[in-house]
Curated annotation (Swiss-Prot):
Residues that bind L-aspartate: T120, N124, D125
Pfam entry (one): Arginosuc_syn_C
Compartments, record wording: Cytoplasm
Organism annotation: Nitratidesulfovibrio vulgaris (strain ATCC 29579 / DSM 644 / CCUG 34227 / NCIMB 8303 / VKM B-1760 / Hildenborough)
Name recorded for this polypeptide: Argininosuccinate synthase
Length: 396
């Protein structure tokens, strides 16, 4: 069909992508190669390659991409301080360009004519996958079965699976979940009513605040050029560091978010997110910037952040504007080296101390005590000049 002889499929091993695997082979009469990416989702991936092969794949890749994910995707985003709509730390969004990148690389190695994904026609992920492929390999076709087939319900998917001998899990999931080392998201079910409180099954990476310890914990995070490198003085690899902070933040109930967001496709959706380690990195990094980056550079970067965050959320990681913004951001991060001390208590994290060899904080200028460096009289001329523009503006 359409000259497609081989397709590379992003494969999780679940019902949807297992049905897609068989559907691709039957509908397109083609060879299907699968990619299962380990992004630190802490799922047991043993046997997922065997399941893919039994379902009809000609080859099954299961790849550990955790360090690349943390180093080349999470950390650049964290250096920018990216937050979508003022709240969301983009845990799902940032994973898609890496998966798409590997799909393209495997497609090239396998001589495939197309890649495929299991994202639905209502969500953002279809856009993210396909824009990434457009940027990296515009000659490859992208197949999105949810936009092509006639299967419209879970019952129909189960019937297709039974017809083709695909194993079906007996346990029904309460939520649609997506997890990687940075976060876990929950959608669907009772959450589709924005008035309903999330249930206990929406706690995976962080405990409810009521179950968090009754005593505060202090931790330190070290940064070099904007990247976190150590926790409590222990240097860790990027992936190990994120996981360490997930464990620390999670036990204090840190990083929970319940919000209604604006999808790129125009739909409002409710999501519940857990990002314990990412929240700690974000808070500490922002605080360290306060003593390392000058005012105008920081304000220029801050003005750009909504555009940067939207670029990631909307699927433009590989777009020239995101790369241009990243270049400016990374220049600003050259000075961001130092240590931040955080106090953690029942869902909250406060910076309580920071130090840097590149600090721009001057005690002699900031002190309320007598200071020979600063002459208070100089402020009068400064204020007078600043007032020229608005002088008389509101005069009756």
């Amino acid at each position: 069909m359409s000259g497609i002889k081989k397709v590379v499929l992003a494969y999780s091993g679940g019902l949807d992508t297992s049905v897609i695997l068989k559907w691709l082979a039957v509908t397109y009469n083609c060879e299907v190669v699968t990619l299962t990416a380990d992004l630190g989702q802490e799922e047991d991936l043993d046997g997922v390659d065997d399941k893919a092969m039994r379902t009809g794949a000609s080859r099954a890749y299961v790849e550990d991409l955790q360090e690349e994910f943390a180093r080349d995707f999470i950390f650049p985003m964290m250096r920018a301080g990216a937050v979508y709509e003022g709240r969301y730390l983009l845990g799902t969004s940032i994973a898609r360009p890496l998966i798409a990148k590997r799909l393209v690389e495997i497609a090239r190695a396998e001589g495939a004519q197309a890649v495929a994904h299991g994202a639905t026609g209502k969500g953002n992920d279809q856009v993210r996958f396909e824009l990434a492929v457009n940027a990296l390999a515009p000659d490859l076709r992208v197949i999105a079965p949810w936009r092509e087939w006639d299967l419209r319900s879970r019952t129909q998917l189960n019937a297709f699976a039974e017809e083709h001998g695909i194993p079906i899990s007996s346990s029904a999931k309460q939520y649609s979940m997506d997890r990687n080392m940075l976060h876990c998201s929950f959608e669907g079910g009772e959450l589709e009513d924005p008035w309903n409180e999330p249930g206990p099954n929406s706690y995976v990476m962080a405990v409810p605040m009521e179950q968090a310890p009754d005593e505060a914990e202090y931790i330190s995070i070290d940064f070099e050029h904007g990247n976190p490198v150590a926790v409590n003085g222990e240097r860790l690899s990027p992936a190990a560091l994120v996981k360490k902070l997930n464990s620390i933040g999670g036990r204090h109930g840190i990083g929970r978010l319940d919000m209604v967001e604006n999808r790129f496709v125009g739909i409002k959706s409710r999501g519940v997110y857990e990002t314990p380690g990412g929240t700690l990195i974000h808070i500490a990094h922002r605080d360290l910037e306060g003593i390392c980056i000058d005012r105008e550079t920081m304000h220029l970067r801050d003005a750009m952040l909504p555009r940067y965050a939207a670029a990631i959320y909307n699927g433009f990681w590989f777009a020239p504007e995101r790369e241009a913004m990243q270049a400016m951001i990374d220049v600003s991060q050259q000075r961001v080296t130092g240590t931040v001390r955080l106090k953690l208590y029942k869902g909250n994290a406060w910076p309580v101390g920071r130090q840097s060899p590149n600090t721009l904080y001057c005690h002699d200028l900031a002190t309320f005590e007598d200071c020979a460096t600063y002459d208070h009289k100089d402020a009068a001329g400064f204020i007078k000049l600043q007032g020229l523009r608005i002088r008389g503006y509101k005069k009756g």
